[in-house]
Amino acid sequence: MITKKTLLYNFIFGASTDTKIKTYYHLLEPLFHTMSDHNMFLNLGYHDKNESFPDSIVTTQENMVENVTKDFNKLGLWLDVGCGTGAPACHLSKMYDDIEIEGINIVENQIVKARILAEQKELNDKVQFLFGDACNMYSENESYDNIYAIESAFHFENKLNFIKEAHRTLKPDGKLAIADIVYKPELAKITDFYKVAIAKHGLATKEFYSGE
């Protein structure tokens, strides 16, 4: 049995970025489920400041997914890079009749949960979840009509390789959309304070995401 102490050790001293990412999501799984009201979303969500704040955080998460993909042609095969537990892909595939989505992820237990979610929502004919590395995809050239990565790109050890792979696997008129977490220097005093507190509890710091 893997203990929390072992997970924390793997997170802090893990030999690879992949190990740290897997451990990070394993440790914070209960928190993400609480944040998403157990609807399997792992992203932070998107709130338009000109609108009243939604009653449910799930609404903001759905807003994020819809906003990221709003300029896509709503047909063909899409790729969800860093698909989490499958909620974004399932949400989009229910919205649009003429699309299919493949999701890739390096966190095995999330793939299992994504497949369960697809079965529960009766979407097995429209979504597929596979183990896959965003920086070294198995897909053939020009496989996808659109590719999106929602709050996952900051994990990629070599972001240039991801861009190259996205370019290789996109069809000529395909689009790539990325939602990332951006660090603002003017917030340095606040983030430096919280960085110390976060590190004490074994959570990810800015340096972990940026590769510093």
Residue ranges and their predicted role:
Residues 55-75:
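Conserved alpha-helix/loop element of class I SAM-dependent methyltransferases that forms part
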Residues 1-35:
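N-terminal auxiliary segments of SAM/dcSAM-dependent transferases
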Residues 206-212:
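Short alpha-helix
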Residues 146-157:
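A short SAM/SAH-binding and catalytic strip from SAM-dependent methyltransferases
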Residues 182-205:
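Short, glycine-/aromatic-enriched active-site segment of Class I SAM-dependent methyltransferases
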Residues 135-147:
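A short acidic, Gly/Pro-enriched loop at the edge of an enzyme's catalytic core
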Residues 160-175:
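A short glycine-rich, Lys/Arg-flanked "PGG" loop and its adjoining helix->strand segment in the class I
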Residues 77-79, 85-136:
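Class I SAM-dependent methyltransferase SAM/SAH-binding core
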